[in-house]
Amino acid sequence: MRVRRTVVPLSLLLLAATAGCGKEATGPTGPSPGRSFLEGTWSGTLTIERPGEPASTGQVTWTFQTVDGTNLQSFRVTIRSQHAWLPITTTVTSAITPSNQPPARISTQGDYASPRGCTGTLLSVGNAETQTINADFSGVDCSSLPNSTFTGRVTLTKTG
């Protein structure tokens, strides 16, 4: 009788241990990475200053999409500017440091098709909080044209 009591529990243990062998995983194998606080739409103002010109301000929207495999620290960003001198829509890249949580330093850079018929470059560095981004904004529009460099600021609030 003693042998039978040992064999039955051992058989059940072996059956349970091998039940999943040879099968593909059907669910998540690790924790979900979640969403970044930056994901979504941010709206606000873009102020641009150019040599010999007064500062001017226009509306701007940035939409952040997290790049997979970057610990929620790198993003594709679509910028839609309604600024009179820089009416552009472009997709650039952003990164945040030192972690993926606010407050964070944010750096954004990329190229855009200038309304003046060339390729411009932009750079923005600043601070990202849970609901606001405040950063400088600079670049070179058409380097062959006068007053092609610009500086300024972008101030954004999370809207979606």
Protein language model features and the residues they cover:
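Short, aromatic- and cysteine-enriched interfacial helices/patches
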Residues: T29, F37, W85-P87, R116-G117, ...
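Bacterial N-terminal signal peptides that target proteins for export
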Residues: M1-L10
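Bacterial signal peptide processing site
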Residues: C21-E24
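N-terminal leader/targeting helix
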Residues: L38-V60
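Beta-sheet ligand-binding and adhesion/scaffold domains
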Residues: G44-I48, N71, T97-G160
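Bacterial N-terminal signal peptides
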Residues: P9-A17
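N-terminal glycine/threonine-rich, aromatic-flanked beta-hairpin/loop signature
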Residues: E53-S99
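N-terminal helix-cap/turn-to-beta initiation motif at the start of protein domains
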Residues: T26-S43, V67-D68, K158-T159
